């Protein structure tokens, strides 16, 4: 059965999206991403040498033939994000964009007001916008209404590896959304990625948990397998949760004859 994910003009077989930060080397990053099976990777514009011919990150990403999703990490408001997006489109030749606006450098919480403002402007400018946001069901609907191709609510703070601390809100967002929901930030273990997929998320984005693992290549593969398992479980429909016990084996009536 085909179970591809379609976002705007692209179709993906893998539902694991990945980041490129924090890896020790470009080569290590490449092998981890390859092992994960990821087809879409996000990269911060500030990490790319636009004028350079041999940028390390881009060299390895092009070798893997990944789809690039530039992000506006570092932008503090809508104006800066739109400027960064324009540079990214010119430098990388893609209108796809992960919109990130977080003015607080300590906790990196996304600014909902500036994000909505920037999203509306960028969609009108022809960008395929995937906004990183709080797990706010109302905000997600507003972003959907202005034309975002997907929404990317956080599971917990960026790089925290705390997992799905926003689970209750993620469930509401997934239930109400008419665009793909990609759980982004805070996923620290393959089991947490599987959990997000079991909830019905269209995809997850993972970076830190892979990049700082003891064996990044093995962890990449583990995340790829976990996402597949979680998606399969969701499609198979999980058994209902019950407070009562239910025997898995039938009662044996012959015992009554003893």
From Swiss-Prot:
Similarity remark: Belongs to the ThiG family.
Name used for this protein in its record: Thiazole synthase
Taxonomic source organism: Cytophaga hutchinsonii (strain ATCC 33406 / DSM 1761 / CIP 103989 / NBRC 15051 / NCIMB 9469 / D465)
Catalytic activities: [ThiS sulfur-carrier protein]-C-terminal-Gly-aminoethanethioate + 2-iminoacetate + 1-deoxy-D-xylulose 5-phosphate = [ThiS sulfur-carrier protein]-C-terminal Gly-Gly + 2-[(2R,5Z)-2-carboxy-4-methylthiazol-5(2H)-ylidene]ethyl phosphate + 2 H2O + H(+)
Function: Catalyzes the rearrangement of 1-deoxy-D-xylulose 5-phosphate (DXP) to produce the thiazole phosphate moiety of thiamine. Sulfur is provided by the thiocarboxylate moiety of the carrier protein ThiS. In vitro, sulfur can be provided by H(2)S.
Gene name per UniProt: thiG
Top EC class, one word: transferase
Active site: 98 (schiff-base intermediate with dxp)
Enzyme nomenclature, EC number: 2.8.1.10
Keywords annotated in UniProt: Cytoplasm, Schiff base, Thiamine biosynthesis, Transferase
Binding-site positions, 1-deoxy-D-xylulose 5-phosphate: 159, 185-186, 207-208
Cysteine pairings via disulfide bonds: none
Compartments reported by the entry: Cytoplasm
